[in-house]
């Protein structure tokens, strides 16, 4: 993941105090260093500033951000967090339209697609993303978020000024913007948490761009456009057609997400979701003469204290080992002690900027910090139960 941040105002001229506002942009990406750490950059114009903290995945050498391109004397700039999986479909169309690609990064594809197709181009993207584009010709700043909200994007808008960031903590680097909670904030944390009401940023006057939406900020103010929405329709396919369709989508999804300029691994719990992802990823790696790295996690002494329940009748380990025998991956078993878990609790809250699922967040943060030493990209079975409406196995 990367971290993005920035601000925009058509009433203020940021370059009148250039060093001051450049320092603000630097402070914003420094707050997001845990989201990247490979590189950082800023971009400042009279009416907009962009800041980026990079985790390099695609075109490690030439994909630096903010990325700026020029047309008819105007700047077009982007800061982007995410992955686009259909660049192979977009590049030929853009190339034939006369766009000259200087990198192999998906960042450049997004920026050129905006310049060519306009603001609604986002409906053409297949991927997970949050990004901001400054259109120097139209004097407009756009904020985009992917269809299901995989990548976060928070913002504050007041008195003709917009501030945005991947995490709330970076917003509070902006002058006169400080964290405060309200009665509604407490309702969110105590009644809804660890989830949130869609669009709610918990802190006072902080909001989150809705999944499947994009915002446009200009002289007319802030507008919100829905480019995609989940529809509830009767399922009319036969059982056989459903199996074939889901199989195609899973294979296509994993294949597209294996494309990276850095090693890709999977998390393997032995459950249905992670096992399917791992099996498909391992097959892809074998086709390319490589072995997939996999990781599983457990708590120290869980073999002694584990108690069966209806949600988890057995430990993960036997199922993990079964999948390892089937997939022939290069596997690493990771453990977390109770002491380490306790030490990570505050770090987990700081990473989310608010209370979450305590031991779940803390252990995941710890395990991910270990995995990152070997792999920057991992595929997991997260959220499959949400898409299929239940965490329990079904026929």
Where on the chain are the PLM-derived regions?
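Short, high-confidence coil segments that cap the C-terminus of an alpha-helix
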Residues: 261, 375-376
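Cysteine-centered catalytic environments shared across enzyme families
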Residues: 1-351, 364
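Conserved small/polar residues in nucleotide/adenosyl-binding loops
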Residues: 388-395
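Conserved adenylation A10 loop of the ANL superfamily
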Residues: 270-274, 381, 389
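Active-site nucleotide-sugar/metal-binding loop of Leloir-type enzymes
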Residues: 371-372
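Short acidic/histidine-rich active-site segments
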Residues: 376-385
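Long, Lys/Arg- and hydrophobic-enriched amphipathic alpha-helices
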Residues: 352-360
């Amino acid at each position: 993941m990367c971290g993005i941040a920035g601000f925009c105002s058509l009433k203020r001229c940021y370059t009148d105090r250039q060093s001051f506002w450049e320092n603000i942009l630097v402070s914003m990406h420094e707050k997001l260093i845990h989201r990247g750490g490979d590189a950082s950059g800023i971009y400042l114009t009279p009416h907009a500033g962009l800041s980026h903290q990079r985790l390099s995945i695609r075109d490690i050498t030439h994909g630096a951000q903010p990325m700026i391109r020029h047309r008819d004397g105007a700047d077009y700039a982007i800061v982007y967090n995410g992955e686009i999986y259909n660049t192979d479909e977009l590049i030929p169309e853009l190339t034939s339209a006369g766009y000259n690609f200087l990198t192999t990064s998906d960042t450049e594809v997004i920026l050129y697609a905006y310049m060519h197709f306009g603001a609604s181009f986002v409906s053409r993207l297949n991927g997970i993303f949050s990004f901001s584009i400054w259109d120097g010709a139209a004097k407009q700043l756009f904020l985009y978020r992917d269809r299901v909200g995989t990548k976060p994007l928070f913002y504050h808008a007041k008195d003709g000024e917009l501030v945005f960031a991947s995490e709330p903590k970076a917003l509070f680097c902006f002058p006169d913007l400080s964290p405060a909670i309200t009665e509604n904030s407490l309702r969110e944390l105590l009644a809804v948490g660890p989830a949130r009401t869609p669009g709610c940023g918990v802190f006072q006057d902080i909001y989150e761009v809705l999944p499947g939406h994009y915002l446009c900020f200009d002289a007319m103010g802030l507008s919100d456009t829905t480019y995609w929405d989940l529809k509830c329709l009767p399922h009319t396919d036969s059982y056989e057609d459903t199996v074939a369709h889901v199989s195609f989508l899973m294979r296509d999804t994993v294949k597209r997400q294996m494309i990276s300029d850095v090693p890709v691994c999977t998390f393997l719990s032995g459950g249905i979701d992670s096992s399917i992802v791992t099996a498909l990823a391992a097959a892809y790696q074998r086709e390319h003469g490589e072995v997939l790295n996999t990781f599983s996690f457990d708590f120290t002494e869980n073999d002694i204290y584990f108690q069966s329940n209806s949600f988890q009748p057995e430990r993960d380990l036997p199922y993990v080992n079964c999948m390892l025998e089937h997939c022939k991956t290069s596997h690493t078993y990771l453990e977390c002690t109770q002491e380490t878990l306790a030490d990570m609790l505050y770090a987990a809250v700081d990473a989310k900027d608010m209370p979450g699922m305590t031991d779940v967040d803390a252990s995941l943060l710890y395990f991910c910090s270990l995995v990152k030493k070997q792999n920057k990209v991992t595929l997991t079975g997260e959220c499959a139960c949400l898409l299929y409406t239940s965490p329990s196995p079904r026929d």
